[in-house]
Amino acid sequence: MAAVTELDDQEMREAQREYLDFLDDEEDQGIYQSKVRDMISENQYRLIVNINDLRRKNEKRASLLMNNAFEGLIAFQRALKDFVASIDGTYAKQYEDFYIGLEGSFGSKHVTPRTLTSRFLSSVVCVEGIVTKCSLVRPKVVRSVHYCPATKKTIERKYTDLTSLEAFPSSAVYPTKDEENNPLETEYGLSIYKDHQTITIQEMPEKAPAGQLPRSVDIILDDDLVDKVKPGDRVQVIGTYRCLPSKQNGYTSASFRTILIACNVIQMSKEVTPVFSADDLAKIKKFSKSHSKDVFEQLSRSLAPSIHGHSYIKKAILCMLLGGVEKVLDNGTRIRGDINVLLIGDPSVAKSQLLRYVLFTAPRAIPTTGRGSSGVGLTAAVTTDQETGERRLEAGAMVLADRGVVCIDEFDKMSDMDRTAIHEVMEQGRVTIAKAGIHARLNARCSVLAAANPVYGRYDQYKTPMENIGLQDSLLSRFDLLFIMLDQMDPEHDREISDHVLRMHRYRSAGEQDGDALPLGSAVDILATEDPNVTSEEQQELQVYEKHDSLLHGVKKRREKVLSMEFMRKYIHVAKIFKPVLTQEAASFIAEEYTRLRNQDQMSTDVARTSPVTARSLETLIRLSTAHAKVRMSKTVQLQDAEAALELVQYAYFKKVLEKEKKRRRREGESDTEEEQTQPDGEGKKRRKKRRAQDGESHDPYEFSDTEDETPVVHTPKTPVNGQEEMETDSSAKPGLSGDRLKAFKSALLDAFKAAHAQSIAMAAMMEAINKNNDSPFSQAEVKAALELMEEANHIMVSDNIVFLI
């Protein structure tokens, strides 16, 4: 037995010497010597070693390390400590241990949780998966120091368990007495502890076989590896595979629990902060200066280029990705800078595709669905820890997306209780939990991009937007912009969409030949921690524009160049850093337009609001103006930014409503009807208006006058509503009062109410006010006819010669 132990020690010393030779490569390229010096300067104690370098220099030792990991890693770490001591002796004494992390090509040992079988026990493996669960970080004792007051001596004891690399676990009991039964005092300040965390990673859904549930494996993280990952991250974990015996009734059972003791964790998810070179920044600066007039149009057009149309929605999503400026006042009040957008519309209008594009573009984005997530799943949940049985908090999607975007699809399918759970997050940017003895406040400063279908499945144009949307005002007011996306029957528009979609389906990437069958399975798996193709791509210079492809981009137009996604991502990242300040001109414009928005539909008869205009709408205008200024990389918010924000808001806030066709008796002969049908379109509309005016029917506030007898084709307003009102003609004009005169009367009456600063005005005062400075004054008959019409439309009420504004 002694001979075997001596042989093991000799082998260990031999392995340690070979590893030391590998690290001391000053005569060769000096890679690892410089790495160790960098590690010392950064105050780290884990060295990342590429297994390919060890394989190239000492193939036998690399093979032994891969297949007999525990002894190999212990020898490697001892060699590292000796090498650090030879470079900097004082630094080597600061830490109890130095650690080795591995990377490189693992070949057959590059596995998923499903293919991690018993033949890999005691080997180094690389496992890919998605982190599903993270435990709390707890301290674990490594060495305890005890002092005996009677003998004035100190005793040290080291502790190891089955999650350590050492072969034999030690006793976990603290000594309380020495050999002579003298009591001992534990010196906690001199004892050494290490951080300890358990995570669970699950097989990636794209790697799992069809029709089978993904499998998972437990990972042990120690020291500097703790808190490197969070739930939802895609990771590669390199470590040693070990089994832990489980006891039943005092006896070790034949079934074992397996764990992976990690020595390195590599993130596979996209980087939150892209890497910038000086050339990249120069290109971004040059682009913003050379396209100073149309930079907003250019960027929004390059957003989701595979989706045709929806230009206003793309502009809103661009503003959402940039966000406004968050303000925290001295008294603790927080004014949010995140922009929330809600898309409501018919099926198949590319709502989910827009959400998916944001997931690929935004630096941090978390996807959820309405039925697949609960209120606590979105905010935070109180769960029971499996190891200790304690209650603890688990972060939900919105907490994980802090400073990012949450994309919620099928928003209308969520229950009301779950929807109310996100009220606080959307306005305050935090989650407050007070349950099960836990009171906590978590940051959730994220933008919300939600997509929903209308109440009736499809949008009913004969009902108001509020009836179609079916969400509470308290929730709608928290969305900065609400877009109604309609699937309209327009032959020209349908032709453009079909041409665009067919081109997408005909497109093939550069490596494919025409006529070749596309592979059904996934691409070839790279059995290494680094993809060699990715490194070559990173060395290429940043392309500002996508290379033009006739199938992807259609007929080449000089002005319609599409920016590359990588350039978009970097441009957005740089633009977000700016914090523009409102100028006086922009501030006064926003204040004036906000008051106009509040009074917009008092006199308008053909549009309805999609969401309530509250004080939050004023903040919306400020946030959108700031985002537009960020696109220009400006330090101030100018008037043009405020005008662009107003255009977006007016497009999103107002929606036209149709009135269903009413069956009326024919009051004219058959010959008149035939005459009408043969009339040109414009004359026919005039005649219908005239006939309706003679009938003197009551006028509905949400009524279209010129589309009563036709199939409704409703377009969402693309110009500010003020312009639309001027184009509309009122069909309810009585004989002797034209539509223009009625409109002029309404405008004059509204001005009179504003001047009086009151909700009621006497008839005599009203007559004087509307005819003051008027080139064509209103007669008594005209005023009477106009008041009757407005009273029928529920705009005003006349009583005792006093006009009341309703």
UniProtKB/Swiss-Prot annotation:
Record field: compositional bias (Basic and acidic residues): 693-702
Subcellular location(s) of the protein: Nucleus; Chromosome
Domain of life per record: Eukaryota
E.C. number: 3.6.4.12
SMART domains from the UniProt entry: AAA (SM00382), MCM (SM00350)
Binding site for ATP: 345-352
UniProt-listed InterPro entries: AAA+_ATPase, MCM, Mcm3, MCM_CS, MCM_dom, MCM_lid, MCM_N, MCM_OB
Primary location group: nucleus
MF annotations from Gene Ontology: ATP binding; ATP hydrolysis activity; single-stranded DNA binding; single-stranded DNA helicase activity
Key words, A-Z: ATP-binding, Cell cycle, Chromosome, DNA replication, DNA-binding, Helicase, Hydrolase, Nucleotide-binding, Nucleus
Top EC group: hydrolase
Cellular component GO terms held in the UniProt record: CMG complex; MCM complex; nucleus
Reactions performed catalytically: ATP + H2O = ADP + phosphate + H(+)
Region (Disordered): 662-738
CDD domains from the UniProt entry: MCM3 (cd17754)
Extent of motif Arginine finger: 477-480
SUPFAM superfamilies named in the record: Nucleic acid-binding proteins, P-loop containing nucleoside triphosphate hydrolases
Domain MCM: 295-502
One BP annotation, GO: regulation of DNA-templated DNA replication initiation
Assembly with partners or alone: Component of the mcm2-7 complex (RLF-M). The complex forms a toroidal hexameric ring with the proposed subunit order mcm2-mcm6-mcm4-mcm7-mcm3-mcm5. Begins to associate with zmcm6 into mcm complexes at the neurula stage. Component of the CMG helicase complex, composed of the mcm2-7 complex, the GINS complex and cdc45.
Similarity annotation: Belongs to the MCM family.
Function: Acts as a component of the mcm2-7 complex (mcm complex) which is the putative replicative helicase essential for 'once per cell cycle' DNA replication initiation and elongation in eukaryotic cells. The active ATPase sites in the mcm2-7 ring are formed through the interaction surfaces of two neighboring subunits such that a critical structure of a conserved arginine finger motif is provided in trans relative to the ATP-binding site of the Walker A box of the adjacent subunit. The six ATPase active sites, however, are likely to contribute differentially to the complex helicase activity.
This protein's name: Zygotic DNA replication licensing factor mcm3
Lineage, top ranks: Eukaryota, Metazoa, Chordata, Craniata, Vertebrata
Gene: zmcm3
